[in-house]
Swiss-Prot record:
Organism: Azotobacter vinelandii (strain DJ / ATCC BAA-1303)
Binding partners and assembly: Homodimer.
Protein's recorded name: Iron-sulfur cluster insertion protein ErpA
Cofactor: iron-sulfur cluster
Gene3D superfamilies per the UniProt record, alphabetical: HesB-like domain
Matches recorded under PROSITE patterns: HESB
Amino acid sequence: MTVETFTPTPLLFTQGAANKVKTLISEEGNPRLKLRVFVTGGGCSGFQYGFTFDEDVAEDDTIVEREGVSLVVDPMSFQYLAGAEVDYQEGLEGSRFVIKNPNAATTCGCGQSFSV
């Protein structure tokens, strides 16, 4: 009998997102800050993404580091975000962090909510 282990696909923290986080943390003057990405119920498609800066990291959080800054995800949110890409975009709609999520079956027009 063989036992298979599950290794989730990591979250991709793009260069653009890391650079913007670094800039925002520098402007805030608090090097302990990390970008926390989370999923909550709501939005027009059932779930929505959230972003906040946080100094605290829980023992079971997933941490992705790039360019000397950290992206943090709690375990409940990670199950919806495994394999996703966190990026920062500037365009006609303004500047914002965006998530390209391969787990999302549908997304709303603004890209901030999704269903699985």
